[in-house]
Amino acid sequence: MIGHLAAMLPPPSTNSPELTVSELSAALKRTLEDRFGIVRLRGEISNYRGPHSSGHAYFCLKDQNARIDAVIWKTTFMRLKVKPEEGLEVIATGKITTYAGKSSYQIVVEAIEPAGLGALMALFEARRRQLASEGLFDEERKRALPFLPAVIGVITSPTGAVIRDILHRITERFPRPVLLWPVRVQGETAAAEVSAAIEGFNALPVTGQGPLHRPDLLIVARGGGSLEDLWGFNEENVVRAAAASSIPLIAAIGHETDWTLIDYAADLRAPTPTGAAEKAVPVRADLLTSLNDLQRRHAGAAYRLLERRRSDLRALARALPQADSLLATPRQRLDRTATRLATACLRAQDQRGLVLGRLAHRLSRQAPHASLARLGQKLEAFGRGLGRACEIAQERRRQSLLHLGIRLTQNFTQGIRVERERVHGRRQKLASLDNRLRQAMSLTLSQRQARLANLAQLTRSLSYHAVLARGFALVRDETGQPLRRAADIIENHVLTLEFSDGCRQAVAGALVATDPPVDPKPTRKPVQKSSSPKPSSRKPKKSQQEDLF
């Protein structure tokens, strides 16, 4: 390569023009790019501080004896499967080029892969320690799985044996609805699809608020494979999505010996996808057996408790005194109180009857019939007077117009124009007076009619017919006088019963004894004797026993 560069330079003894720095830099750039093209470098990443604000990444690749600058452009950095990390030994694939600003050469990296299994394990441990320091793997964050989820969400490949094993195991143990979110479980886009699926399930509405029900449990599953095949489940975005999931999550990645970072962040790790299905739902037959056993034990316990309560009740019943001896004194006290209560009720009824009689007499003197009749007569007389006044006024206007016409005829030649204007004005005034008169008549009639309607409504509300309309009846004797008490009715006399829609005649029968209403305020408090009387040996009458019970 040095000989090739020397051949491009002019001999010192010639008169060839000199090269500029830019020309020399461009020549070196072309020589390096044409000579090496795409290369694969193995080295350790150093001086890496994360992507620049522009999105590009700058670092160095070094070994024991040398180092080279490296750059990853933004578009390439976004699609890298393995991101650069400080101290990670990698194999970088890219093109050798120069940077004219520093007169140095560098590699433009197109792809990065860990340099062997040891590098991947070192990256795995470093990432695990970083995420653990943030508390993503703490046991306090993990939630208990639902005992019997209504809907189970599965995130895996739709074509592999994993989904078939999960569906078969769930159907065999306890059939539950399963929502599958198909994703790639290997490759460059696997991590992004798995994290998007976890976030998508968490974004679904709760049960009953949309066409898709939000799962009660998530299963992230994949079959076995090498560390490189399972690396997508070690990506930081997948681990953070699993830790942030509000739905309990089971991770079933690979076989029992395979561990990924999502296993640490999940609420439960299953050794295999089949084991995840077994953790998700119980065995229906075992539940039925346990339920039947609990039912038998509950029935036996209830029977034993009932028998024990029956024995206790029998023992307590034998210790109780006889009911007749306990109720003898209260029954006698009740008989005496009932007799006093009947007397007090009759006395209160008489007092209320006197009060109602006085109120009825006052109401009959203030009945609105007379005032309504007087108001009607006044209204009728006012209407007749108003009509006569209108006729007289119209007649006077006609006479005035007649005189005006005669005068207009006599003085037609001198002032016909003036008289026409005067006649026109009088007609307008007459029309105005007539209109005002009619309005006054209409207003007065409306006011009188409204007052008459109010008085009629008052008459109806104060009349006893409103009481009859509510289901009561007015009882009159043969002379037409109202009867207020049953004791005033003579047996076998003809009575007139007035209802709201008419009258009926009836013949009075015998007086029937009924329970008088209880007066809440007796006029006299019963006097309690100091010594209780002896129980009477005489049995109460049949009618009294019926009234009491």
From Swiss-Prot:
Reactions it catalyzes: Exonucleolytic cleavage in either 5'- to 3'- or 3'- to 5'-direction to yield nucleoside 5'-phosphates
InterPro entries per the UniProt record, alphabetical: Exonuc_VII_L, Exonuc_VII_lsu_C, OB-fold_nuc-bd_dom
Protein EC: 3.1.11.6
Any single GO BP term: DNA catabolic process
GO cellular component: cytoplasm; exodeoxyribonuclease VII complex
Subunit text: Heterooligomer composed of large and small subunits.
Pfam families: Exonuc_VII_L (PF02601), tRNA_anti_2 (PF13742)
Broad class of where this protein is predominantly found: cytoplasm
Spans annotated as Disordered: 511-549
UniProt similarity note: Belongs to the XseA family.
Organism of derivation: Beijerinckia indica subsp. indica (strain ATCC 9039 / DSM 1715 / NCIMB 8712)
Name of the gene encoding the protein in the UniProt record: xseA
Organism superkingdom: Bacteria
A GO molecular-function descriptor: nucleic acid binding
Key words, A-Z: Cytoplasm, Exonuclease, Hydrolase, Nuclease
UniProt-recorded name of the protein: Exodeoxyribonuclease 7 large subunit
Subcellular location, record wording: Cytoplasm
Function (record text): Bidirectionally degrades single-stranded DNA into large acid-insoluble oligonucleotides, which are then degraded further into small acid-soluble oligonucleotides.
